[in-house]
Regions:
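Hydrophobic transmembrane alpha-helices of multi-pass solute transporters/permeases
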Residues: 1-74, 90-121, 126-133, 137, ...
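Helix-breaking motifs and short loop linkers at transmembrane-helix boundaries and internal kinks
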Residues: 128, 149-154, 166, 183, ...
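Glycine-rich segments within core transmembrane alpha-helices of 12-TM secondary carriers
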Residues: 31-39, 112-113, 167-173, 182-234, ...
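C-terminal ends and interior cores of transmembrane alpha-helices
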Residues: 138-151, 366-383, 437
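Short hydrophobic/alpha-helical segments at membrane-entry points of transmembrane helices
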Residues: 152-160, 217-218, 386-394
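Intracellular juxtamembrane helix-capping segments at the cytosolic ends
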Residues: 92, 169-182, 318, 401-420, ...
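Non-transmembrane, juxtamembrane loop and terminal tail segments
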Residues: 1-12, 237, 244-292, 424, ...
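C-terminal transmembrane helical hairpin of 12-TM major facilitator-type secondary transporters
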Residues: 358-408
Length: 499
């Protein structure tokens, strides 16, 4: 009988970056472009056309009780509206007294995102990655079709909520599934590429919204096509070997790895191959209890959750505050997205070379310096070409936030056990969505003080840097499969032998 070995060693044998993983990565990264377009679709369409001119309120005529006809001439301003700039605000008349509804499209989406990431991601740990992804993709398709055929504002908000609801669970489950079919560094690479694709999708949304009034009609078919391809892929693919082994389904885990071997055109595992059994977790049926009942994991999730909240504040608040930096709102949104690309790709290099923890600290520092400079009027009012320095500093801070966002997905998953990995990431993401929900209303902070959003972001960054000091480095470390292995990662205790 062959000696028992671990899943990473088995994936080494069948190929951890072969055809199977490359196809998965292409679908995973490609979906992020669509998701980025969906997330920022309403923002790109929520810029009020500047050609709308409203008249002053008409003067009320005095009541005329006589039967004589009175001819009156009132001089009022002309009401003029130009339909050449079409967006969802003009379609549902969300201007004048209805302006407060402008941010609701994005807020409802993020409320759904928070609800979904709280309720759905734990299903991924409980019922498996494959079944969860199939169910979430079906729900995602339903919400997309419903949104495309909405005929009222209530229907738009309803389906926008469920689009965020299913998108949130899908994003976490897709990421978890991919990481468990390959090595951690490959998972980190794919996640950063996914984040880059997400921002490119958001920038393309802004660009298309600026040039084409009917661009949003072409988005649903792309979403349906991408979701259908992913759905077929997961129907054909097996469950991840990590999840199967955590459930002590050794033979199924070996069969899953052999499926990867066939797609990668490598030799399968020997018939007498054995995987190391995991210690059965006491709370295996409840992923939340695995985290809450362990002091180490609970403390780590609390610290990482605040880091997620901080990054979400910097990323989305600055994105939705694009019109307050003094330049054209469309231009700032587009540049923000495209400048995120080098920021996210560069953090990939630093994360592989110097580690996750060190890279996060460096990017937090650059973000803090950029936002701190936004508080100096004499500097921010200077121009570089046609853009103010304030716009440049905001874009740098936004880019660093996007880079850390990609890194935190990977970093968080690498410190959690298999049966609580998806749940732990979702708990952190839930906290981040609180900032996302509030982000569209940063205009209220601008009415109090234009610098308040930068003060808040700066304070959050400094606090996060302090809290993350106790999180261990995970570079070149295998994914922990049990709570005991997490304890080793955090405290260096003697490793519990598998039985």
């Amino acid at each position: 009988m062959a000696a028992a070995t671990s899943i990473p060693e088995a994936l080494d044998h069948v190929g951890y970056l072969g055809r199977f993983q490359i196809i998965f990565m292409i679908l995973y990264v490609g979906s992020a472009v669509i998701h980025g377009s969906i997330t920022f679709q309403f923002q790109a369409l929520s810029i009020m056309p500047k050609v709308i001119c409203l008249s002053q309120r008409c003067k009320t005529l005095q009541e005329n009780e006589s039967k004589d006809t009175l001819i009156c001439h009132l001089d009022v301003d002309e009401w003029k509206f130009d339909n050449s700039h079409f967006n969802w605000l003009t379609e549902f008349q969300l201007y004048c007294d209805n302006t407060y509804l402008k941010g609701m499209g994005t807020t409802v989406y993020f409320v759904g995102f928070m609800a979904g990431v709280s309720l759905l991601s734990s299903l991924c740990d409980k019922f498996g990655r494959r079944k969860s992804n199939i169910s979430l993709l079906l729900g995602f398709l339903f919400a997309t079709i419903g949104l495309h055929h909405s005929t009222s504002l209530k229907m738009v908000y309803f389906f926008r909520f469920f689009l965020g609801f299913f998108h949130s669970g899908l994003s976490v489950c897709l990421f978890t599934a991919f990481c468990e079919f390959t090595q951690p560094n490959v998972g980190a690479f794919a996640n950063v590429l996914c984040g880059t694709a997400f921002t490119v999708g958001g920038s393309v949304s802004s660009l298309l919204a600026y040039h084409n009034r009917y661009w949003q009609d072409s988005l649903p078919p792309l979403i349906l096509f991408q979701a259908a391809i992913l759905l077929i892929y997961f129907v054909l693919c097996p469950e991840t070997p990590f999840w199967l082994l955590a459930r002590n389904r050794n033979s199924d885990a070996i069969e899953s790895i052999n499926f990867v071997a066939r797609i990668n055109r490598n030799s399968p595992l020997p018939k007498d191959y054995q995987l190391l059994h995991c210690q059965e977790e006491k709370e295996a049926g409840n992923p939340f209890r695995i985290i809450i009942s362990n002091v180490t994991l609970r403390d780590a999730i609390m610290r990482l959750s605040f880091a997620w909240f901080t990054v979400s504040t910097c990323f989305y608040a600055l994105q939705f505050n694009a019109g307050a930096v003094g330049d054209d709102e469309y231009s700032v949104m587009i540049w923000m997205g495209f400048l995120d690309v080098p920021a996210r790709l560069s953090i990939l290099y630093f994360a592989f070379r110097y580690g996750r923890k060190c890279s996060a600290r460096w990017y937090f520092t650059v973000c803090a310096v950029s936002l701190g400079l936004c508080l100096i009027p004499s500097v921010t009012e200077m121009y570089l070409g046609t853009m103010t320095f304030k716009s440049i500093f905001v874009m740098v801070g936004h880019g660093c936030g996007g880079g850390i966002f990609s890194l935190l997905y990977t970093y968080t998953s690498e410190v959690l056990p298999t049966l609580a990995r998806s749940t732990g990431v979702s708990m952190c993401s839930t906290v981040a969505r609180i900032a996302s929900i509030l982000s569209p209303f940063v205009i209220i902070l601008n009415q109090i003080s234009g610098s308040l959003i930068y003060f808040i972001s700066l304070a959050c960054i400094l606090t996060s840097m302090s809290l993350m000091k106790s999180i261990p480095e995970t570079l070149n470390q295998p994914l922990p499969n049990t709570v005991a292995e997490c304890e080793v990662l955090f405290h260096g205790k003697s490793k519990v032998e598998s039985v």
